[in-house]
Amino acid sequence: MNHNRLGKSGLRVPELSFGTGTFGGGNDLFKAWGSTDAGGASRLIDVCLEHGVSMFDTADVYSDGLAEKILGQAIKGKRNRLLISTKVTFNTGDGANDFGSSRQHLIEAVDKCLQRLEVDHIDLLQLHGQDSNTPVEETLATLDQLVRAGKVRYIGGSNFSGWHMMKSLAVSDRYGYPRHVAHQIYYSLLNRDYEWELMPLAEDQGVGAMVWSPLGWGKLTGKIRRGQPAKPGTRAHDIAGTGPHFEEERLFRIIDALDVVAEQTGKSIPQIALNWLLGKKTVANVIIGARDEQQLIDNIGATGWSLSAEQNALLETASDVSPAYPVWHQRGFPQLNEPR
């Protein structure tokens, strides 16, 4: 398993991490993702560690905290072999301060995460969403306090706008606070919006991308394709209408291209879609999920090989989409935006 530096930091992370959204199934939303218990989680974690996947991503809202509890139980005796990333910011209760990136919420949220995980520190704490109501200075001063207290090692954001990430980095630089070294983002062959604004920012500022839902909300498994809708009662059918809007014909073009590459390489469609991401600049880590060992091993098979230039070009062309303004305008003046 290759390791990459996470942004400008000295922290090295495996190119794949394991997402725990399938742990617990503690409410209707997460039951649809999975309901892995502590025993099943322990087996999946052992498989991950055997294959070099030594980073585990979770969040306080996953199954109302149950995912963190199960992860904590499953890693007992293994803590020194792995990295934990978790996320806070979204609603965890009905109180007026049970959400957001305020000092009040962050300190309480981190303490509760540590209790559920049964650990003394979090390797990477990410703000799960952009809080435009709390002053960035307050948020970063609090994160600085948590780092100095030894409760958190590194910080990052998730689902931020470009302006908010840049403002956060500027405030950190001004006051000497820890910088966001990671940005957990939605990115796949089906959803390439990250490339327009956030990728150039990440490259310029040294922010490593951690990719969530790398199979496009489950659309890039090969189970949904032209003339072959997912069978009723299957997970592929259940998620067919979920997630961000997408153009169906574009999805089918991408699947057709993946089929061509699969025939050439002998790799599965998910493996190819994941491998394409691993080759993208600024991507430090791709978060995979699995509800059973076979699915996990198949996803890990995305590593250890590379797409050819021709195969990569085929996938790039099939998945291309017109960018939003001002990116389409900037592309009309390539002499002003030459690659470094």
Each language-model region and where it sits:
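Glycine/proline-rich, positively charged
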Residues: 27, 93-197
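Short, well-ordered coil/turn segments that N-cap beta-strands
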Residues: 11-16, 51-55, 78-82, 119-123, ...
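Aromatic-lined glycan-binding groove of carbohydrate-active enzymes
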Residues: 194-234, 268
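N-terminal binding-site loop/beta-alpha segment at the start of enzyme catalytic domains
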Residues: 1-82, 148
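Active-site beta-loop-alpha junctions enriched in small/polar residues
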Residues: 21-23, 59-61, 87-91, 127-130, ...
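Conserved, mostly hydrophobic/aromatic
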Residues: 6, 18, 41, 56, ...
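Generic structural signal for well-ordered alpha-helices
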Residues: 45, 68, 72, 110-114, ...
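Terminal-tail/helix-coil boundary detector
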Residues: 2, 42, 204, 228-260, ...
